[in-house]
Amino acid sequence: GVPCLCDSDGPSVRGNTLSGILWLAGCPSGWHNCKAHGPTIGWCCKQ
């Protein structure tokens, strides 16, 4: 999957670890949405 920025990672992608994975069809079982706003397409999820 494509890494994405969770809310807990910090405000921007610069210098922060991207701990989430981008899922287009929603978070799979056992994962949760870790970004309150965005991304525009898909969901940023982490285990």
Curated annotation (Swiss-Prot):
Organ and tissue specificity: Expressed in ectodermal glands. Not expressed in nematocytes.
This protein's name: Delta-actitoxin-Ael1a
Origin organism lineage: Eukaryota, Metazoa, Cnidaria, Anthozoa, Hexacorallia
GO molecular function, a single term: sodium channel regulator activity
Major site of localization recorded for this protein: secreted
GO cellular component, one term: extracellular region
The protein's role, per its UniProt record: Binds specifically to voltage-gated sodium channels (Nav), thereby delaying their inactivation during signal transduction. It strongly stimulates mammalian cardiac muscle contraction. Paralyzes the shore crab (C.maenas) by tetanic contractions after intramuscular injection.
Disulfide bond sites: 4-44, 6-34, 27-45
Keywords, ordered alphabetically: Cardiotoxin, Disulfide bond, Ion channel impairing toxin, Neurotoxin, Secreted, Toxin, Voltage-gated sodium channel impairing toxin
One Pfam family recorded for the sequence: Toxin_4
Subcellular location, record wording: Secreted
Family per similarity comment: Belongs to the sea anemone sodium channel inhibitory toxin family. Type I subfamily.
